[in-house]
Amino acid sequence: MKKNRLLFRVIILLILCGAVGFTLYQGFFANKEKMQIGKEAPNFIVTDLEGKKIELKDLKGKGVFLNFWGTWCKPCEKEMPYMNELYPKYKEKGVEIIALDADETDIAVKNFVNQYGLKFPVAIDKGQKIIGTYGVGPLPTSFLIDKDGKVVEQIIGEQTKEQLEGYLKKITP
C-alpha cells in the first residue's frame, strides 16, 4: 500500500515538473524565435498617452529604442529614469524612445508616467498584440531598431544607465 502511494506521488510530481518545464520553455524560449536580428521590424500603430499616433514606419531615418515594460515590473521601474534622463540628448541626435506598456489600465500607466515625469512617448499595447508580434517574453525587453527599420539587437532584462547609453549610441543615425 505504501509502495503504491509513493509511486503515485512520484508520477504526479513528474507530471507537474513536466508541465512547469513546458510552461517555462514557452514563456522564455519559444517566443524569442519570432524576432530575427537583421530583419525589418514589424510595423505597428499605437496612440500614446498624449493622444498622438505613433507608427513605426514613420520613424524610418531615426534610430528607435522600443521598450516593452509594465508598471508592476521592478526592473522596468529602475531603468525608466535612465531612459528619461538620456532621452533629450539622443532625441536631438535622431533617436526615438518608445515605451509600450503590457496592456495595463490607462490610470495605472498614467500614474506611473506622472510619478517619474517621463518625457518620451508611452503607449499601451492593448491586447498585447505588439508583444505577440515581437515575441516578447519576460519584461523588460527592448529592441534596437536602426534608421533603416531593421532590428539590430534584442535586450532582455534591466539595463544600467551606461548600458542604455551604449545602446542608444549604437542606433544613432
Swiss-Prot record:
Main location: membrane
Transmembrane domains' residue ranges: 10-29
UniProt KW keywords: Cell membrane, Cytochrome c-type biogenesis, Disulfide bond, Membrane, Oxidoreductase, Redox-active center, Signal-anchor, Transmembrane, Transmembrane helix
Subcellular location(s) per record: Cell membrane
Chain coiled-coil ranges: none
Annotated membrane topology: Single-pass type II membrane protein
Signal sequence coordinates: none
Disulfide cross-links: C73-C76
Superkingdom in the source lineage: Bacteria
GO molecular function: antioxidant activity; disulfide oxidoreductase activity
Pfam families: AhpC-TSA (PF00578)
GO cellular-component term (any): plasma membrane
Domain Thioredoxin: 35-173
Annotated InterPro entries: AhpC/TSA, Thiol-dS_OxRdtase_ResA, Thioredoxin-like_sf, Thioredoxin_domain, Thioredoxin_ResA/DsbE_sf
A Gene Ontology biological process term: cytochrome complex assembly
Pathway the protein contributes to: Protein modification; cytochrome c assembly
Cross-referenced NCBIfam families: PRK03147.1
Described purpose of this protein according to its UniProt entry: Thiol-disulfide oxidoreductase which is required in disulfide reduction during c-type cytochrome synthesis. May accept reducing equivalents from CcdA, leading to breakage of disulfide bonds in apocytochrome c; following this reduction heme can be covalently attached.
UniProt similarity note: Belongs to the thioredoxin family. ResA subfamily.
Protein name: Thiol-disulfide oxidoreductase ResA
